[in-house]
Curated annotation (Swiss-Prot):
Family note: Belongs to the CAF1 family.
Protein's job: Catalytic component of the CCR4-NOT complex which is one of the major cellular mRNA deadenylases and is linked to various cellular processes including bulk mRNA degradation, miRNA-mediated repression, translational repression during translational initiation and general transcription regulation. Within the complex, plays a role in miRNA-mediated deadenylation in embryos. Within the complex promotes germ cell development and fertility in hermaphrodites. Additional complex functions may be a consequence of its influence on mRNA expression.
Entry's Gene Ontology cellular component terms: CCR4-NOT complex; CCR4-NOT core complex; cytoplasm; nucleus; P granule; P-body
Name of the protein this chain belongs to: CCR4-NOT transcription complex subunit 7
Lineage, uppermost ranks: Eukaryota, Metazoa, Ecdysozoa, Nematoda, Chromadorea
Gene ablation phenotype (knockout): RNAi-mediated knockdown either results in sterility or a reduced brood size. RNAi-mediated knockdown disrupts the arrangement, differentiation and maturation of oocytes in the proximal region and as a result small oocyte-like cells arrange in several rows in the germline. RNAi-mediated knockdown reduces miRNA-mediated deadenylation. RNAi-mediated knockdown reduces ccr-4 and ntl-1 protein levels. In another study, RNAi-mediated knockdown does not alter the levels of let-711 or ccr-4. RNAi-mediated knockdown results in reduced global poly(A) tail deadenylation.
Tissue specificity statement from the Swiss-Prot or TrEMBL entry: Highly expressed in the germline. In particular, highly expressed in germ cells that enter meiosis and progress through the pachytene stage.
Gene symbol of the encoding locus: ccf-1
EC numbers for this chain: 3.1.13.4
Organism: Caenorhabditis elegans
Length: 310
């Protein structure tokens, strides 16, 4: 089943004269066709903003943890291994944040069954209210193995020229990694980061950008929608649907990059590339009372409780 929804005129940044946005709903019946289209855009649109929707957080790890980041990874580990993807959104843009002339954004819909798969009732109800059709997911959703195989051959992974853009990305990359390997996430966080570096060698997490001294004075806080609102970045599409959230991620990233970094980007980028908010050493990056919020002031709610996707 091929379907698409159109937003208002505008590219990732909502610029006047940009193409009309077309969010393609991708199911099993058209997944190969849409990945073929994606392969045609890789060279000229190498920035891939990505968002996932999944059935919440159902498990909390118990035990003694070395740090908040250690706890956070164990929570990602438990939940990603237990749960299934519901949607993945890709918005591909060029180095100016512009969509292809066709305005394509992709929203992949995965096979999901209330009878067989685990979920958080609260999270699933939120997604249902956002318009996700769970009957279609059960009947025509994409099996994870099919998506992982097509993603592997898409030209989007293992290439450092492809830049992945995310917002609080631990769960996002966790689910993508699981779809590619078809196995559980590594128990050790260091192994997870090695796999991430191999598959997604260039990636930036907006939540990490917000911790840099460049952004400190703006005091941008909250989830993706709240940060976008503070920057006057307009959403196209429906909140809590992965295609719209991916597009908003792209627009927000390029607004931050232009407004706060300018000629300084090439100095900052190597320091934050590959970091995921709440994991690794991310909570100690740029850690000072003068430059950004202190560790105790900004609990990574995107990893403890309901993920901060939008």
């Amino acid at each position: 089943m091929a379907s698409s929804s159109s937003g208002g005129a505008g590219g990732a940044g909502g610029a006047s004269g940009a193409p009309e946005v077309k969010i393609h709903n991708v199911y099993m019946s058209n997944v190969e066709e849409e990945f073929a289209r994606i392969r045609g855009f890789v060279e000229d649109y190498p920035y891939v903003a990505m968002d996932t929707e999944f059935p919440g957080v159902v498990a909390t790890p118990l035990g003694t943890f070395r740090s908040k980041e250690d706890f956070n990874y164990q929570q990602v580990f438990c939940n990603v291994n237990m749960l299934k993807l519901i949607q993945v959104g890709f918005a591909m843009v060029n180095d100016k944040g512009e969509l292809p002339p066709t305005g394509d954004v992709w929203q992949f819909n995965f096979n999901f069954s209330f009878a067989e798969d685990m979920f958080s009732h609260e999270s699933v109800e939120m997604l249902r209210q956002a318009g996700i059709d769970f009957t279609l997911l059960q009947n025509n959703g994409i099996p994870t193995a099919v998506f992982g195989e097509l993603l592997t051959t898409s030209g989007l992974i293992t290439d450092p020229r492809i830049t992945w853009l995310t917002f609080s990305s631990g769960y996002d990359f966790g689910y993508l990694l699981k779809s590619i390997t078809l196995g559980d996430l590594p128990k050790e966080e260091s192994t997870f980061f090695m796999c991430h570096k191999t598959l997604f060698p260039t990636s930036f997490d907006i939540k990490i950008l917000l911790r840099t001294p460049n952004c400190a004075s703006a005091k941008l806080k909250g989830g993706l929608q709240e940060v976008a609102d503070q920057l006057d970045v307009k959403r196209q599409g429906v909140r809590h649907q992965a295609g719209s959230d991916a597009l908003l991620t792209a627009a927000t990233f390029f607004k931050i990059k232009k407004q706060f970094f300018g000629d300084n980007w090439n100095q900052i980028a190597p320091l934050i590339c590959g970091h995921m908010f709440g994991l690794g050493s991310s909570l100690s990056l740029f850690h000072s009372s003068g430059s950004t919020s202190r560790l105790g002031d900004e609990t990574p709610q995107g990893l403890i409780g309901v993920p901060q996707q939008a």
